[in-house]
Amino acid sequence: MEDHYHQVEVEGEEEIKPSKEANKTDENTSSLRIFPCLFCSRKFHSSQALGGHQNAHKKERTAARRAKRAYDFVNNNDFLHTLPVFLSSPSQHHLTILGYPASASVACFPTVHPDHPIFKSSGSHVVLATSHQGRDCKGGYCCQQRVDILDHHYNVVNSDKGKDQCLDLSLHL
């Protein structure tokens, strides 16, 4: 094996510097380095290209960061078990980004706390469900549970086609 270093004497002191051959091998190995994108698994040959590409994922990173903060907040605050959870159906795109399979739905998510009421509304249809966790729960997911559902249907009146209603939205205090 060749020694790619040589000694240089500078004012009575010896200094070891790499030779030109060693610099060439360092350049070759640095050009072979691959920088993967953590969101879409694309690979880039320079960190600058990866950085530019990651700007395209800014919305996804923000959504993932918000979801993590909300999850941490709920799990670190004991008083929240008395508050109802209002659920809306997340888009499949956001479920996939957050690490849930594309087939996931709201029902797949872990319950926050036993006996925690859950409200869900889809326009005229309102559901209140209270989950009672059993002994077979593992890791926050309920294997067996009893769900009490209070289901109400409300008549929603739509305005005539093409006619707008004028509503007074001012708040008089």
Curated annotation (Swiss-Prot):
One Gene Ontology biological process: regulation of circadian rhythm
Motif EAR-like (transcriptional repression), residue numbers: 167-171
Principal localisation: nucleus
One example GO MF annotation: DNA-binding transcription factor activity
Region (Disordered): 1-27
Domain remark in the UniProt entry: Contains a slightly degenerated ERF-associated amphiphilic repression (EAR) motif, which may be involved in the activity of transcriptional repression.
Official protein name in the record: Protein LATE FLOWERING
